[in-house]
Amino acid sequence: MQLRDGVIEAIGNTPLIKLERVSAATGCTILGKAEFMNPGQSVKDRAALFIINDAVKRGELRPGGVIIEGTAGNTGIGLALVGNAMGFRSVIVIPETQSQEKKDTLRLCGAELIEVPAVGYANPNNYVKISGRLAAQLAQTEKNGAVWANQFDNVANRQGHVETTGPEIWNQTDGKVDGFVCAVGSGGTLAGVGMALKARRSAVRIALADPMGAALYSYYTTGVLKSEGSSITEGIGQGRITKNLENAPIDVAYQIPDSEALPLIFDLLEHEGLCVGGSTGINIAGAVRLAKELGPGHIIVTILADYGTRYQSKLFNPAFLREKKLPVPSWLERKSSIKVPYE
């Protein structure tokens, strides 16, 4: 029988999907790694698994122990599901501004959810810093251990992509990948995949796709962390160099406005049947830019990070989009003209 022994073995080995319309428009083969097909429906399942396994190996976490994390949602979902499968509880600290869909999913997965005001990283009450203090507090009372996942600075996150995502991309493209592009939240995916691909062929181009409001585009182009503008995307956009980003082999950086990313998301759903989230729009826009820079005939890979249904109240809400002065696809408000044949 072909089977996977439990949810843990179902993480990873996701397919590469050719994105037909952007491939045709650029003359390149643009491929999306379908990370929404992981059990927790996002790329963050990989980081969750490696972070938990690392804590277990170090003896910091035993069955019945608690995993604490500050997250915009997807990492928390991954930690909760992997934790359930391995016998751990999860406590998630989340900015109250995150989508209701993510909050509901975290609760559905059994996580204890703590919502806090959204403040910058410099503020001591930033959600990440609160989660760190909470982990230290719980470690004093939890007999089976309480660990802070610390996805931003725990390099077990990056190692998950060095060992799995990067090699998968290399093997799936028969070693012919020319470029890899994605946005940064913790930095684990971009750095880990970049390191894995560069180790196999140094000429592979590694590109950062940065949303407005983040500071990394400025850092990788001028050496100064500086942000401008804003974005409705969630879970990406970083204002500092995390431990996962240290020594990341980034060759080029692009700054992507929402007005460039969102039409790609809507087009992908309408014409190719893929419903993806905002960060994936940033990723695809970055892939298009790299494809245009390299020229026709190249193979570019990016990350399809999660499902768009996780952002339905914002990303696919006409009123919200208009409020933010962003494009609204006509089909989103289409009314049926079909007459129902009642008897």
Residue ranges and their predicted role:
Residues 1-343:
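PLP-dependent amino-acid enzyme catalytic core
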